Amino acid sequence: KPIMDEDKCAEVALEYMKTKYHEDFEVTYSQEKKRIIGRAGYAEVDVRVKGKEKEYRIMMCPDGYDDTDKDGYYDSYIVISDDYMCDIVNNKIKVELDSNVKNVIVNKFISDIYITERNISKIEGFWGFSSDFSFNEKNNTLDGLLKNENVYITYRIEVPENEFSMDYEKNITEILKPKISEDIISISIVSYPEETYLKREKIYKEKGYEEIGGLIGTDEIDFFIEEETNESK
């Protein structure tokens, strides 16, 4: 049985990313730069925009199962998914989601979001959004995304201790539930002492949420919002 050619996968992935996103990407040469799992039928290629540190992952599969030249490798490859699209969707939708939450948490909060397409077909190795997904005027709003796509949203909110309320779950659910179809929204609301919160807020505003670091809070609510037919009880 043929295996996957990691150099060819990297070549196809790089061309796909440059063509779709019009950025100058490079395949990364750090650890496990191209993780190939040929026996599982997929490969992972990591890339980054030249001059930037953040890496993105592309999931590859053989385009058919031929090995016509009998060199032990599949002849060709296709991209199944990538997670660069996650950043594009996250940045746009976060603004709207924060705006909705401001109707509940009227004072201070900071937040982080991660959105991925739901792997309805259970494709092994799927990560991020499918290669045929496009972010356009039909789905580039919160309402449009939840109406037209099957997505999984992970949303984390941090507040000072004196702002925390157990009513947040009920109130946020009431706002967001009417918008969803086959989507799932996972929400965590965490409180911190005022001094700790202000330190985290400062880093968030100056450098972004990724630079804050994990820290157990004083109180926490974790809940899912799903459509009525499969709602978590």
Task: State where each predicted segment sits.
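Short, non-transmembrane alpha-helical segments in secretory-pathway proteins
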Residues: 1-30, 89-105, 170-177
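Sterically constrained small-residue positions within well-ordered secondary structures
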Residues: 18, 36-38, 144-146
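Exposed beta-strand-loop-beta-strand "reactive/processing" segments of non-cytosolic proteins
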Residues: 24-62
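Intrinsically disordered, low-complexity segments enriched in small/polar residues
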Residues: 36, 49, 70, 123-126
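Short, low-complexity, polar/charged sequence segments that are solvent-exposed and flexible
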Residues: 46-48, 65-66, 172-178
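A short, surface-exposed beta-strand/turn
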Residues: 54-84
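Metal-dependent nuclease catalytic core centered on acidic motifs
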Residues: 75-208, 213, 218, 222-233
